[in-house]
A protein has these predicted regions:
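Charge-rich, solvent-exposed alpha-helical interaction surfaces
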Residues: 6-9, 27, 61
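Secondary-structure edge/capping motif, primarily at the C-terminal ends of alpha-helices
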Residues: 14-21, 42-50, 79, 83
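Short, charge-rich amphipathic alpha-helices with coiled-coil/heptad character
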Residues: 1-21
Length: 85
């Protein structure tokens, strides 16, 4: 096979849809890492905080971050399953 034929074959394997899926997967993975860091920082703040109002606010913020991470993890799992197919 010539190089041009090999390149055409490669393009067929990595179609635009597949590249977009990979980019989305990587992007979500980066966002999840940032959310995890933010959640850990909030946990530390919550441990140090003594004011009840501030603790409730921090806890709400942590709950929101946790929900966002769970949604992101679920989307990541779906993309991973689609990647296998």
């Amino acid at each position: 096979m010539k190089a041009a034929e090999l390149l055409e074959k490669l393009k067929g394997y990595l179609g635009a849809e597949r590249r977009a899926q990979i980019a989305k997967y990587d992007s979500i993975k980066r966002v999840l890492k940032k959310l995890k860091k933010k959640e850990n920082a909030l946990k530390d703040k919550l441990k140090k905080e003594h004011d009840e109002k501030a603790r409730k606010r921090l806890q709400k913020e942590m709950d929101v971050l946790s929900a966002q991470r769970k949604k992101g993890v679920n989307v990541l799992k779906e993309l991973k399953e689609a990647k296998k197919k």
